Amino acid sequence: MFRAELHRLAGRQAEALANADEAVKISRETGPAFLGPFALGALALASEDPTVRRAALAEGEALLEAGAVSHNHLLFPRDAIEAYLEAGDWEGVERSAAGLAQYTHSEPLPFTDFYVARARALAVLGGQRSSAESLTAEFERLRKEGERLGLRVALGEIVKAIEKMRG
């Protein structure tokens, strides 16, 4: 999964897809509850085929509901949020953010709080459901928080949103 993510971030889509496919195959052979949702999230991000993406997201969500190991409840929603953002599926973004928030409700984590707030702000912007002024302040806050947490990979969309809002 990590190789798939690195290839995807470097713009090597074919390699990302091959690595994600292999990760899903291995997770199915060895027990999908351990890394299955995480692998399926990587596949959803690596695939440019909407059918493959939707199937990977649906299967990952089903595995979480069936009872996957804890790290999947943190990493799959992060990737699902990204996949839904790329697809412009604001309901999917909101649903994944809500699931992540619910999972960490009793033990909040800065990592998940950041991704939940980021997802919700980007969904609001994408759905054009808020004033520019309030959203700009939230994106500025998220940019600072993302920098503080070292989550540089998540900052690109935030910076784009700030630039878009400033016109």
Where are these regions (language model features)?
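Conserved binding/catalytic microenvironments
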Residues: 1-6, 10-11, 18-22, 26-27, ...
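Alpha-solenoid helical repeat architecture
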Residues: 1-3, 11-14, 27-43, 64-79, ...
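Residue at a conserved register position within TPR or TPR-like alpha-solenoid repeats
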Residues: 7, 40, 47, 84, ...
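Residue-level detector of the short coil/turn that links helix A to helix B
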Residues: 11, 48-51, 88
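Single-residue signature of alpha-solenoid repeat helices
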Residues: 16, 53-56, 93, 131, ...
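The canonical alpha-helical register within tetratricopeptide repeats
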Residues: 22, 29, 59-62, 66, ...
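Compact structured core domains
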Residues: 70-71, 84-88
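C-terminal structured "cap/appendage" subdomains that terminate the fold
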Residues: 116-167
